[in-house]
């Protein structure tokens, strides 16, 4: 039985495009469907654009493996495709003695995960790198950095198309019906259609659960409950005296409000974590005081009134 595609990927964010690229370069006839007018319009455009080294995940877990291997592959991909990045490094900073044990645990976890370039620093060593910090010690991750996420996604689109695949915008996924040797996929948009594929990959981010529910016969008990973890960012007016990413020790469910500077030089702090019931990307100005107090734990020199609401993202949480 012939099919229209070897694989259809739903969702043209960073994950969906990476799936499309991996399939296309292995000779698969691939289409990546995206309901929006541009790629990366969801989670992939509302985050910190940080390349993590692999410190935070349990040894032996898929997250640990994918983060460490993926980080190495990502830097190589960015080099090959001339996508901008800054391997600036990251400091995870303890501001009180009670947080030092968390740094030791992260260092041990990083070693178990095979993370390169991780160094435990005392207060003097930390201040030698970033004198404006308040700290009693830190963990330095030399392999962490920031990158141009949109440039990365554009490069993935180019690779998919160069290998004969297609990225189709304005094409919402309406549902699918598996048959014996193929899957019928219903597509909306200006010209609704039904196509067939051997494989269907749902990379719909915040809509992934809804999409899975429209696949006929897919077990409902295999669709995990979704929780919206909103994170707001505040931009800094003026200059921040840091050359590296600055993070607190992680908190349950998140990495904590951190400092990062994008490739254009804009400094931001965020994200926090607020569970919400609906997709709401407005940044509440009333959260500014909380952000100021949080940031001053590690940067006591933050000027009054220097933070302004910037943007928010929503992370899909399964727990």
Where in this protein do the model-derived segments appear?
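N-terminal Rossmann-like FAD-binding beta1-loop-alpha1 element of flavoenzymes
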Residues: 5-32
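Conserved Rossmann-like nucleotide-cofactor binding loop
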Residues: 15, 38, 207
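Active-site substrate-recognition segment that forms the wall
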Residues: 22, 83-86, 181, 193-195, ...
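Glycine-rich FAD pyrophosphate-binding loop
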Residues: 24-46
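Dinucleotide-binding Rossmann-like beta1-alpha1 core, especially the glycine-rich loop
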Residues: 49-125, 256-257
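Short beta-strand to alpha-helix junction loop
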Residues: 58-69, 93-102, 140-159, 168, ...
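Helical element adjacent to the flavin cofactor pocket in flavoenzyme catalytic cores
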Residues: 139-199
């Amino acid at each position: 039985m012939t099919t229209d595609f070897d694989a259809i990927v739903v969702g043209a964010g960073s994950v969906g495009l990476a799936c499309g690229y991996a399939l296309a370069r292995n000779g698969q006839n691939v289409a990546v469907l995206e309901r929006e007018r541009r790629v990366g319009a969801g989670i992939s455009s509302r985050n910190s654009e940080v390349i993590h080294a692999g410190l935070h995940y349990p040894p032996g877990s898929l997250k640990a493996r994918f983060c460490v291997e993926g980080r190495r592959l990502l830097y190589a991909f960015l080099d090959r495709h001339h996508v901008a990045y800054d391997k600036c490094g990251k400091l995870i900073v303890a501001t009180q003695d009670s947080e030092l044990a968390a740094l030791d645990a992260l260092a041990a976890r990083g070693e178990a995960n095979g993370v390169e370039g991780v160094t435990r620093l005392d207060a003097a060593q930390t201040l030698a790198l970033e004198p404006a910090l308040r700290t009693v010690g830190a963990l330095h991750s030399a392999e962490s950095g920031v990158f141009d996420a949109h440039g990365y996604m554009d490069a993935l689109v180019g690779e998919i198309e160069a290998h004969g695949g297609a990225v189709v915008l304005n094409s919402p996924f309406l549902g699918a019906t598996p048959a014996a040797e193929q899957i019928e996929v219903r597509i909306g948009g200006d010209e609704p259609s039904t196509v067939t594929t051997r494989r269907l990959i749902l990379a719909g981010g915040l809509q992934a659960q809804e999409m899975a529910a429209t696949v006929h016969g897919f077990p409902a008990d295999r669709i995990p409950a979704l929780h919206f973890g909103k994170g707001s960012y505040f931009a800094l007016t003026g200059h921040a005296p840091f050359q590296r990413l600055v993070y607190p020790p992680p908190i349950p469910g998140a990495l904590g409000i951190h400092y990062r500077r994008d490739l254009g030089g804009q400094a931001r702090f965020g994200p926090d974590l607020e569970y919400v019931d609906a997709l709401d990307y407005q940044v509440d100005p009333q959260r500014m005081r909380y952000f100021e107090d949080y940031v001053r734990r590690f940067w006591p020199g933050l000027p009054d009134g220097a933070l302004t609401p910037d943007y928010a993202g929503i992370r899909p949480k399964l727990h």
